Amino acid sequence: MTMFNWQQKGWPRATCNRAALRDELAAFKVAFMELKKALKKPQDMEVVARALTDEAVKTSAIEGVNVDESVVMSSICKALGVEYAPKGFTKDARAEGVAQMMLAVREKWNAPLTAKLLTGFHGALMAGEEKRVAVGAFRTHKEPIRVIRRHADGTAEIRYEAPPSENVPKEIAAFARMWKAPATTPADVALKCAMIHPHFESIHPFEDGNGRVGRALVAKTLAEGLDMPLVLPVSTVIARHRAAYYEEINEASRSLDWTNWAAFFIPVLTEMMTSFVAAMRFVKAKRDYLAKYESGFSERARKVVLRMFEDGEEGAKGVLSAAKWMRMAKVSKPTAIGDLQTLEKLGAIVRVGDGIRLEYGLSGFTVEPINEPLNGELDERLLKLAKTHPGVQLSYMKSVVGKSLATVKRAIAALVKSGLIEHRGSKKTGGYYVKEVR
């Protein structure tokens, strides 16, 4: 019979092989320090509101709960004093609840970890759900809490069974004692984030909402490490790796060695921080551009340019043609050409390319580049394998480098993106090669 981690000798003290995580911790440190440097400037409340909203929406989506993003954003912006004009208005109690939890996490970012803090987060999250679950209170029912996977053939598999409800107060007391001390170095922050999450999920102290509260604790741990009230959108990246996230956390629930889990989760945090710094720099570049040119825009031009910014950096760096302007502004071709010529005279757009079609780009729009964290020795070993074993497959790479599949996949993806290696052949039988320079 499978023994879950809380049933094993040594619980609740899980272990993590720090030496085996050298590459992951090094990459985390680069991203963490880059983020800390970016945050030395006054916080842009638009970025803060966007991060809180993204985290609220994605942490809900991971659990299969869809919330209205505009309701979340409106609630958060109102609390932060940020201007926001929602496209419509709907009532969504779950959206309001998760928004209030995010605001509570931001407010209590450096508060001591206590049972009261946890039940407070849960109370905000589940407000209005009193008929369904115990809100703001740990579970007390005698029935076991189980995570069950149902298969296509109708059979069911118990993936996890949490400690009995009667054990929860004792488990939470031990949890709070273990994690009350703040992490002081980037490596300690990474490891605390990686360890606190499966520990909390293994206790599963609430009837519902454990995943959302658990991910909020990761955001709180990062805020403590950064020493500022900032809730980072951890769940936006977890959502991209949702299947692997559930698989890895399920493995952690059956063992007290959480090295493989940490090897998966720390790069997720690294990816999130890198994306967040990019978002901060994009907002600054957008603000700088609009401050320089917006006063000369017509209302129509303003709407089109802002629409380009809605698609992020990729949208802002896209090209404008008369045909595209016609679609976006819903005007005739002569009007579109006239609008573009006016913006060109203003200096807001410049001609790009040398093709037959006349195309423009936003003038001087640049986003400060990011120092992408690398995996150091791991990158070198994977590159060497692709060179000495042309067509090498992922499974062989994993066995040679001795890292988790998630870590190897992420490193390979970065090498492919950088143009150093490429995949050839089918998904099942193809392999990786050093990319030829043409």
Annotate the PLM regions:
Residues M1-R438:
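FIC/Doc superfamily catalytic core
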